[in-house]
């Protein structure tokens, strides 16, 4: 027969179990947030290598011969850029999945939409390396390209490099769109600061503006790029918060901890 003393302890036991469960859930949440943050950080390291460093180092504007000469002289660097795009595509897929795991408890529909839009980056990166591979083959020449004179090969290589850039402009559409559901999830999550979500929304609009100017109004691309830069720091702020701060306690978990 259960004693009266045992019955009076039941609420205390329930509170202890609830408290422990809350702490375990928070630990899991912090772990998942930091994992996603570290993957995102890896993406911010690999992506700029081909996107920014290679063009600024090897490409000479409106000079296919000089560009081809630079690629020949720094073939390993260019090949690393190709591999960097492949690696970025893989990391992008891992990031999308990790963020889905983190936010599916907030809103599964929004998390699924974020996953689908974020997933589109991976095939775009993989398809885009074909443009760089074609440019490299044209620069190197060989028996199969003997029908083309060197200036023709250099011009074709420049064309494929331009196509690579156009593909990036198209990809910015998805870079922007996937940030919108992610931003809403951050705002609703209660374990990340809301200002990060609002900044990500602005970041998404910045990418869309870059996409429109890159495809429709290329003459204004440099101007829009400079204006959009502060907004694009939203992703970096999100990454640093996830890595350094992780996830903060939900209001209900914090209340449970205080009550315990």
PLM feature spans:
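Hydrophobic, aromatic-enriched alpha-helical segments typical of multi-pass transmembrane helices
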Residues: 6, 12-260
